[in-house]
């Protein structure tokens, strides 16, 4: 029998999706800073199968998952999860969150980690308002990203909604904005919070272009991922649309 009380607090689970084509230090640093900010028990890295808002990744799913596994090796709090790759059809986030909610149960706090640009486009997502029934949303605000509320908020205060946001998101923030990130651990879903992450000017597009041109991509992504890329001859030949 478990010695953990039935009402013991459960630490939140972070969820970071992406094509990871390839995974790089920008992804890893974002996950680490989110883990630290919210005391996450773990962060799930979920490679997209068929993303609905962008062209399908050029690299096969098995290799993108393999690169993620290489990058996360030795990180006890980071896990690769292939649930979207095992599912047919578009990789809608709402379906992913439904699956994770069934897995972790109704009490566990789930936290969807998004960049600011993805958050601002949230109203275009499939069944986007249902996301808040299934998880919290943590928005990473890069210092170089222009805030839509007109001025930089204090370091310990989340931003106020403003005219730069779509009206639907203004309504969401008015109802769901978390006064403190610690609130995420107190409920399983429904809140929106913001935090500033370290800006790393690294993109998968840049890495692919460097590799297609035969140039070095060292120090932009883990050495284990570079070895995987070399072993499997990825990002070689005609890049087409890198």
Residue ranges, per PLM feature:
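Nucleotidyltransferase catalytic core that binds NTPs
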Residues: 1-242
């Amino acid at each position: 029998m478990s010695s953990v009380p039935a009402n013991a607090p459960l630490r939140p689970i972070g969820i970071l999706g992406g094509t990871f084509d390839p995974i790089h230090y920008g992804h890893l640093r974002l996950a680490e800073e989110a883990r630290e900010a919210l005391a996450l028990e773990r962060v799930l890295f979920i490679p997209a199968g068929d993303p609905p808002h962008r062209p399908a990744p050029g690299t096969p799913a098995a290799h993108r998952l393999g690169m993620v596994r290489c990058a996360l090796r030795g990180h006890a709090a980071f896990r690769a999860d292939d649930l979207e790759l095992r599912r047919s059809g578009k990789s809608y986030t709402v379906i992913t969150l439904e699956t994770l909610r069934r897995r972790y149960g109704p009490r566990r706090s789930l936290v969807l980690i998004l960049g600011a640009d993805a958050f601002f486009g949230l109203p275009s997502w499939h069944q986007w308002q249902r996301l808040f029934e299934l998880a919290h949303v943590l928005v990473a605000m890069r210092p170089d990203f222009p805030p839509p509320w007109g001025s930089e908020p204090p370091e310990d205060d989340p931003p106020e909604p403003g005219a730069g946001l779509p009206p639907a998101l203004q309504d969401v923030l008015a109802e769901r904005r978390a006064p403190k990130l610690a609130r995420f651990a107190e409920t399983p879903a429904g809140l929106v919070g913001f935090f500033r992450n370290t800006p790393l000017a690294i993109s998968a597009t840049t890495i692919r272009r460097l590799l297609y041109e035969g140039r070095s991509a060292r120090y932009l992504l883990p050495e284990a991922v570079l070895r995987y890329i070399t072993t499997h001859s990825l990002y070689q030949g005609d890049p087409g649309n890198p």
